[in-house]
Amino acid sequence: MGCFQSTARRPRPGYEDPVGLASETAFSVSEVEALFELFKSISGSVIDDGLINKEEFQLALFKNKRKENLFANRIFDLFDVKKRGVIDFGDFVRALNVFHPNIPMEEKIDFSFKLYDMDNTGFIERKEVKQMLIALLGESEMRLSDEIIETILDKTFSDADTNQDGRIDRTEWENFVSRNPSLLKIMTLPYLKDITTTFPSFVFNSEVDDLVT
């Protein structure tokens, strides 16, 4: 009986104490506990192993497992800090923390810079912005001509690439988003102050609209 009980109560892989996670993040203990219920729902959607794989992550984000999405892949890669191809509960909470309204803007800027710096060169290049823009447009079901996309890229780099070397460094990115705060809308999810069992919906239509206009 004792052996059975100890087996039944064994924590899932990657599970961490809510008190410890709350001390490291902007979440309260009760919010971390609510996030665990959310995590269990996502991690069991395809394979019930206590870990979130890329397919489960994309399904939670976009309700679509039929095709890969560059944006979902980038978010997953940044959540997967241990680079194991799966996200455990600790990874999940710490990564979501950057989207909390109480987190300093500096951390949000860092995360968004890494999001676009797909080659991890320390710079955001034109091809990376183009790939991300096309991925965002695809998810929002907006259709823009190649000419309009190139115009958006021209304007972005004209405004952001102040030293005109054809790429955006970390300082240029910080200055650019400071002048265009709407670009960081996706980096704050207000309802993280009131966690429910619904996965935070990363809806980027507003960001695409801002870019287009």
From Swiss-Prot:
SMART domains for the chain: EFh (SM00054)
Keyword hit for Repeat: yes
Keyword Membrane (UniProt): yes
One GO MF term: kinase binding
Domain EF-hand, first and last residues per copy: 31-66, 67-102, 104-139, 148-183
Binding site for Ca(2+) 1: D117, D119, T121, E128
Lipid-acceptor residues (N-myristoyl glycine): G2
BP-aspect Gene Ontology terms: calcium-mediated signaling
Protein family (similarity comment): Belongs to the calcineurin regulatory subunit family.
Oligomer status and interactors: Homodimer.
Name of the protein this chain belongs to: Calcineurin B-like protein 1
